[in-house]
UniProtKB/Swiss-Prot annotation:
<dbReference type="InterPro" id="IPR048963">
    <property type="entry name" value="ArgZ/ArgE-like_C_2nd"/>
</dbReference>
<feature type="binding site">
    <location>
        <position position="397"/>
    </location>
    <ligand>
        <name>NAD(+)</name>
    </ligand>
</feature>
<feature type="binding site">
    <location>
        <position position="354"/>
    </location>
    <ligand>
        <name>NAD(+)</name>
    </ligand>
</feature>
<keyword id="KW-0547">Nucleotide-binding</keyword>
<keyword id="KW-0520">NAD</keyword>
<feature type="binding site">
    <location>
        <position position="352"/>
    </location>
    <ligand>
        <name>NAD(+)</name>
    </ligand>
</feature>
<protein>
    <recommendedName>
        <fullName>Ornithine cyclodeaminase</fullName>
        <ecNumber>4.3.1.12</ecNumber>
    </recommendedName>
</protein>
<feature type="binding site">
    <location>
        <position position="241"/>
    </location>
    <ligand>
        <name>NAD(+)</name>
    </ligand>
</feature>
<feature type="binding site">
    <location>
        <position position="373"/>
    </location>
    <ligand>
        <name>NAD(+)</name>
    </ligand>
</feature>
<feature type="binding site">
    <location>
        <position position="242"/>
    </location>
    <ligand>
        <name>NAD(+)</name>
    </ligand>
</feature>
<comment type="similarity">
    <text>Belongs to the AgrE/ArgZ ornithine cyclodeaminase family.</text>
</comment>
<keyword id="KW-0456">Lyase</keyword>
<dbReference type="InterPro" id="IPR048964">
    <property type="entry name" value="ArgZ/ArgE-like_C_1st"/>
</dbReference>
<comment type="function">
    <text>Catalyzes the conversion of ornithine to proline, with the release of ammonia.</text>
</comment>
<dbReference type="InterPro" id="IPR007545">
    <property type="entry name" value="LOR/SDH_bifunc_enz_cons_dom"/>
</dbReference>
<dbReference type="Pfam" id="PF21571">
    <property type="entry name" value="ArgZ-like_C_1st"/>
</dbReference>
<dbReference type="InterPro" id="IPR005239">
    <property type="entry name" value="ArgZ/ArgE-like"/>
</dbReference>
Length: 415
């Protein structure tokens, strides 16, 4: 039997870190013994636990320890991180450490270094002479890069549950359900957005990004989101060809997928409107030219151009067109999405499972994340794929956006 002590510190009960350590140890066929356990009595008090983890072999124990580090366990008397150079571009040394999306530090030459730009499913590349470390996706690893291997010298810090009563992310920290009070949730989201916008206006940092699908337009939520962009609540939009195309279709023809937005009735010949919209943008050259020439006079994309809000439109094999602004190289789109979202304070994901999962994979866990979808399974899938910090609002996205705008405008009047 091979054994190693681990430590857990912080709000390890409220944040379910202790429970996760117990569960993962047993799931992997290991065992544990609690050596010390000091529970904080007050809300501001942290807890501490020391556990003895055991495995059948050293390799088995190492596997368990790596999993436990990913949920926040620390190994006392940690050795320096083990580094090995990559022998080829995009080829990693055996035993490389695969990252989580949580803030991470590595111990190099007896000093702890914060790993820049945390994201899941990447590797840690260390620059010892510069006392610097960063995550890199496998395709960006170059020959000679020092890649972290094993589990020594790594400290992972998952986000803890908020201890402040009434905060959105404390209020929502429970199972995904369609039976939660929508009005109360929307008010708390609006309050959080208002605070983030005010901070952004003062500092120019942070802000809110939207990850949006075409259902925003189909359900009639487009004008509400466009107004939020105009009011300065949105600092970036990440979407695909469909959102932009149907937003432009709505602006030019008053339809989405050929259905009248106001009456919800199909329009004769409306099935061609989205192709007409693509053609109009192709003729203008791009969305910006369409706005400046007066072809496009309203909508989400119009407000992005008018208010200088960056957007990243990532292409898909399903796309019609696509419009000229769409990035058809998926790796280029991925890089631009990550750059755009990394510094944001909040990301709101609106009715687009695949784009939400893709964005969640690119960003650190400390970014506040809200996922809105009429299907509870969408939020569950997002969390199961690693974006565990996301809170879910199960509702129609069009209704959500209209009510959210109403609450934001109410907060505007109180200023």
């Amino acid at each position: 039997m091979f054994m190693r002590e681990i430590e857990l510190k912080g709000h390890i009960i409220d944040s379910f870190i202790l429970a996760k350590v117990f569960d993962r140890t047993l799931e992997l066929g290991g065992d544990y013994k609690v050596l010390e356990f000091d529970i904080g009595k007050k809300k501001i008090d942290t807890s501490y636990a020391k556990l003895l983890i055991s495995g059948d072999t050293q390799q088995h124990l190492d596997q368990i320890l790596e999993e436990l580090q990913n949920v926040g366990a620390n190994i006392p008397e940690i050795e320096n991180a083990n580094l090995k150079p990559a022998l080829k571009d995009s080829v990693l040394p055996d035993g490389f450490y695969s990252t989580t999306n949580h803030p991470t530090h590595v111990k190099v030459n007896d000093e702890w270094i914060e790993v820049a730009n945390p994201k899941m499913d990447a590797v840690i590349v260390v620059y010892p002479e510069e006392k610097r470390a960063e995550t890199k996706v496998i395709r960006k690893v170059k020959k000679g890069d020092f890649v972290l291997i094993g589990h020594n010298g790594i400290r992972v810090m998952p986000p803890e549950k908020s201890r402040e009563a009434g905060q959105l992310f404390e209020f929502m920290n429970s199972e995904v359900s369609s039976e939660k009070p929508k009005e109360a949730i929307i008010k708390r989201i609006a309050k959080e957005m208002h605070e983030i916008r005010e901070e952004y206006k003062k500092t120019g940092t942070g802000g809110i990004a939207i990850v949006g699908g075409p259902a925003i337009i189909h359900t009639g939520g487009g004008p509400a989101l466009a107004k939020m962009v105009e009011l300065g609540y949105i600092q970036a939009i990440l979407a695909g060809n469909a959102l932009a195309t149907h937003d432009i279709e709505s602006a030019l023809y008053g339809t989405s997928l050929g259905v009248n937005i106001k009456t919800a009735k199909p329009v004769t010949g409306g099935h061609k409107h989205h192709i007409y919209a693509i053609n109009a943008i192709n003729d203008a050259g791009n969305i910006k030219n369409a706005v400046e020439s007066g072809v496009l006079k309203e909508g989400i994309m119009y407000q992005c151009i008018k208010n200088n809000i960056p957007y990243v439109l990532a292409g898909s094999i399903r796309d019609d067109g696509p419009i000229p602004d769409v990035i058809t190289d998926s790796m280029v789109a991925q890089d631009k999405m990550r750059t755009t979202v990394m510094d944001k304070k909040m990301v709101i994901m609106l009715s687009t499972l695949l784009h939400s999962v893709a964005t969640g994979n690119l960003m650190p866990s400390y970014i506040k994340t809200v996922c809105v979808d009429i299907q509870p399974s969408t939020v569950t899938k997002l969390m199961d794929r690693g974006t565990s910090q996301a809170i879910g609002v199960v509702t129609d996205v069009g209704v959500f956006l209209v009510l959210l705008l109403k609450e934001l405008e109410r907060l505007e009047l109180q200023e």
